[in-house]
């Protein structure tokens, strides 16, 4: 989609790169059942002809960091939902994107797994120094994962509100964020913005 006005530039002010380093993760893992987890997470590298020793070492480290090293030769049907989402994220991170676009990446998971996986993924993305834009309909998830929440209007979608999130916590995990003293305030603000539309 072209912008109505202006241009969109991501880490490329002179326009010299052919493609921006953007990773995209859908709400469903879309792992191929006929490929092993290892073959699934290296698929992007394979397509881009980038299966270098350095990239393979990076994938091996990600598999270890995400607790999937022992499962890399398994098929997706042998993994839990949370493990499959971790594999999908590794596939996204394997190409070393600077910007991650996550479209409801945890919505297919049960609540407990969703909390654990979102916490793991958020911490790993922060540790890697990546920027994440996440689409979610879960207010608690938005508050606990984001530095800034954008509320969109009904169709056609426009930015209705921008709410910076500042939680006073030592532990910045999404699970701990739900216990921050400011959390109820932000939840109420977002809820009011959303109920204004109905």
Question: Where on the chain are the PLM-derived regions?
Answer:
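Conserved ABC transporter NBD signature motif
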Residues: 3-18
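Catalytic "switch" loops of ABC-type ATPases
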Residues: 27-34, 138
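Short helical segment in ABC ATPase nucleotide-binding domains corresponding to the A-loop/adjacent helical element
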Residues: 38-46, 56, 164
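Conserved ABC ATPase signature
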Residues: 75-79, 83
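Hydrophobic anchor residue at the start of the ABC signature
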Residues: 89
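A short, proline-enriched helix->beta-strand linker immediately N-terminal to the Walker B motif
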Residues: 94-98
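Catalytic Walker B motif of ABC-type/P-loop ATPase nucleotide-binding domains
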Residues: 100-103
